[in-house]
Amino acid sequence: MRFLAKLPLSWVRGFAALIGRILFVLAAPRRRVVEKNLLLCFPERTAKERRALARESFIYFCQAWLDRSWLWHAPRSVLEKRLKLHGAVQELEGTTPTIIFGPHFYGLDAAATAIGMSTPRLFTSIYTPLPDKRLDAWITAGRVRFGDVKMFNRFDGIKNNLSGLRAGGILYLLPDMNFGPQESIFVPFYGIQAATVPSLPRFARLGKAKVVPVIPRMTPWGYDVEVHPAWQNYPSDDVEADTALMNARLEGYINTMPSQYY
């Protein structure tokens, strides 16, 4: 990966696109899962359109994975040219406890890197350790490369992340997950009752934090990372309603680029 970091971005993206097209053909079980999800979420689209989205998704996945070569190993000057952080960036300033709502778009690590490069604030996140210790160490090192970043194991509880929030820090949270019925509630997602982790409203309430969506989009020149205004009157006293609202707004973000979401 260090070698790839030295190559022009167009070369890295082109190589990754080739791998993505090959995997789309060979990884049939995964392809069927993607196509099934697209059918559930976008039944109004034709089979041809959904298949094209599925193929694009495989390509974006491979491109985002190889992009981590330069995200985590290229000089800062290279990243400054390829990462465009814009929008309501003032939401990341000050000392108000802040939760970044970071949906699972392929550019999630690019977004985190862009924020880490731009703020002196404590910046925490939650991760699930990988079985491969070397891969886990490489990913963790990449994610803490810039800024005052700390990664906390989700199996160690929420105390460290809450402490960071209450101290005026930022929590990068990816709550659009399904960890099973014991940790989830069922709320609508594209018209289907989906098991959803209610961590966003709970962290916001416990940390007295505002919620700021940050949406990354892969572009030919790198990543466009848009900071949205903080949600108003969030959270409420109703965790289920707050989680349903999160899913509803997530649908809006996904609809702008469905092939970049996973």
Short names for language-model regions:
Residues 76-83, 147-152, 189-191:
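Short, flexible loop segments at the rims of nucleotide/cofactor-binding pockets, characterized by
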Residues 1-102, 106-107, 137-141:
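Membrane-anchoring hydrophobic helices of lipid-metabolizing enzymes
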Residues 95-155, 178-188:
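Catalytic core of membrane glycerolipid acyltransferases/transacylases, capturing the structured
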